[in-house]
Each structure stands twice: as structure tokens, then as C-alpha cells.
UniProtKB/Swiss-Prot annotation:
Catalyzes the transfer of endogenously produced octanoic acid from octanoyl-acyl-carrier-protein onto the lipoyl domains of lipoate-dependent enzymes. Lipoyl-ACP can also act as a substrate although octanoyl-ACP is likely to be the physiological substrate. The lineage of its organism: Bacteria, Pseudomonadati, Pseudomonadota, Alphaproteobacteria, Hyphomicrobiales. Its EC number is 2.3.1.181. Coiled coil: none annotated. GO terms for molecular function: lipoyl(octanoyl) transferase activity. Its main location: cytoplasm. Belongs to the LipB family. Keywords: Acyltransferase, Cytoplasm, Transferase. Transmembrane segments: none annotated. It comes from Bartonella quintana (strain Toulouse). Pathway: Protein modification; protein lipoylation via endogenous pathway; protein N(6)-(lipoyl)lysine from octanoyl-[acyl-carrier-protein]: step 1/2. Substrate binds at residues 93-100, 173-175, 186-188. This is Octanoyltransferase. InterPro entries: aa-tRNA-synth_II/BPL/LPL, BPL_LPL_catalytic, Octanoyltransferase, Octanoyltransferase_CS. The gene is lipB.
Length: 245
């Protein structure tokens, strides 16, 4: 029988993406006002080019958007169920349709993977691990799924799906793009958004499972609480940060 080399799943990939010694810490930027999506996209594209040219440091940008939908490169038109409910933007990231809005913490991640690890699959695993460790600080058990990117929470008190799957909901989505080995776009974590706003799309093209949030799970936390936990978990995986305005 010929030897078959199996591709390792994301659970078994190393999750440490700390930069090579001597590089500056990652800028940690928080915006407290709602940021329009085109403004954020323009900022990311410009910052990514500056990182590649070694004219800007790596950065994580935490923010919230007004209510909107974004379409990734794999989005299907049929999954946009209510095209006039909120503005719809072509994101250019991987993935399908998702919702962004108040009460959701967005983390845009602009890292130079050449300084870290040039492995996109492992990078996505590291982002999932970052979220899982963040959730654990609030005693929420987040899990990854090999066939679905993102972080999921089991719902044992819910009925099984129509296909007989165990019930679980997505609490965090991941959609990234890598240009010249510099990442942008990032992750979104549902803290206390209006989950009804997801009804205008098929989130990430997945019909068998729903979405949840900290509040939906019974956890009343502030965005500041989330930001502290995100920073602590980020530094464990990606290395030191420095606050910027």
C-alpha cells in the first residue's frame, strides 16, 4: 500500500506566530466611534502597502461598524436574502457573506507573515486559537471545525439540525486576505449585536447552524472587557503590542 501523506488539520498546527527578534511590537489601535466600511478598507489597503515597504509597523485595529453586509470572494448572490436591508460591500477578503454592526468587535489584523511564518493555513488556525483563548477567559468554550472556518459554541439544549448534526452556533467569524505576505481584514466577535440582522444573509453560506453572541449565551460584558482579553491572548500567540491612538 503506498504511503499517504495526510494534511494536518488546524487543531494540530503550531499556533505561535511571534515575530523574529528585534522587530518592533505590534501597534494596538482602538476606535471608539463607528467606522464606515469604505474608510476602514482604504486605511487597511494603505497600511498594508506601507508595511510591505517597511514604512509602517504591524497593527491590530479594533473597531465597530454601522450595520452592513460584506461579500467575500466566495459569496453567492443567492445568499444575499435582503439586499436592501443594509449597505452591501465587496470586501475582497476570503469567505462569503457576513454581517457587521454595533455590538460586534472587529479586529483588523495587519501582520507581515514574512517576519513570522509564511503559512496561511496555520495563520488561520492561529487566529482561531486567539479567539478560543479570548473566550476561555470568560468561561466560554469555543471550538474550531475543520470544514468551517471560524469559532463555534455548542448548544446542547437546542434540537438537532435537519441533517442530524449536533446544534452549534458561530460566535466569531474569520475572513482574511494576504497581499505580498502581509495580512489584512481579520476577525469579528459577536459581543451584543442585534442577531436578527443576520436574517438578511446566509452567514458564510452555512444553513445548518446559526449565530450567537456573548449576550445570547448569557454573558453581559463590555467592549472594554473584550478588548483586554483579546490583547492578553494576542500577545501569547503573536507577541508584544504597543498602544497607539
Amino acid at each position: 500500500m503506498p504511503f499517504e501523506l495526510k494534511r494536518p488539520d488546524r487543531n494540530h498546527l503550531l499556533h505561535h506566530f511571534k515575530t523574529i527578534p528585534g522587530n518592533p511590537p505590534v501597534e494596538w489601535k482602538i476606535s471608539n466611534n463607528l467606522i464606515e466600511y469604505p474608510e476602514a478598507l482604504h486605511y487597511m489597503q494603505e497600511h498594508v502597502e506601507n508595511i510591505f515597504a517597511q514604512n509602517a509597523p504591524e497593527q491590530v485595529w479594533l473597531l465597530e461598524h454601522p450595520s452592513l453586509y460584506t461579500a467575500g470572494t466566495s459569496a453567492k448572490k443567492k445568499d444575499l436574502l435582503a439586499p436592501h436591508l443594509f449597505p452591501v460591500y465587496e470586501a475582497g477578503r476570503g469567505g462569503e457573506f457576513t454581517y457587521h454592526g454595533p455590538g460586534q468587535r472587529i479586529a483588523y489584523i495587519m501582520l507581515d507573515l514574512k517576519r513570522r511564518r509564511q503559512d496561511i493555513r496555520a495563520f488561520i488556525g492561529a487566529l482561531e486559537e486567539w479567539i478560543i483563548q479570548t473566550l476561555a477567559k470568560f468561561n466560554i468554550k469555543g471550538e474550531r471545525r475543520e470544514d468551517r472556518v471560524g469559532v463555534w459554541v455548542k448548544r446542547p439544549n437546542y434540537p438537532f439540525t435537519q441533517s442530524g448534526f449536533s446544534p452549534e452556533d458561530k460566535i466569531a467569524a474569520i475572513g482574511i486576505r494576504v497581499r505580498k505576505w502581509v495580512s489584512f481584514h481579520g476577525v469579528s466577535i459577536n459581543v451584543n449585536p442585534n442577531l436578527a440582522h443576520y436574517s438578511g444573509i446566509v452567514p458564510c453560506g452555512i444553513t445548518e447552524h446559526g449565530v450567537t453572541s456573548f449576550l445570547d449565551l448569557g454573558f453581559s460584558v463590555t467592549m472594554h472587557d473584550i478588548d483586554i482579553a483579546l490583547k492578553q491572548a494576542f500577545e501569547q500567540i503573536f507577541g508584544p503590542t504597543i498602544d497607539v491612538s
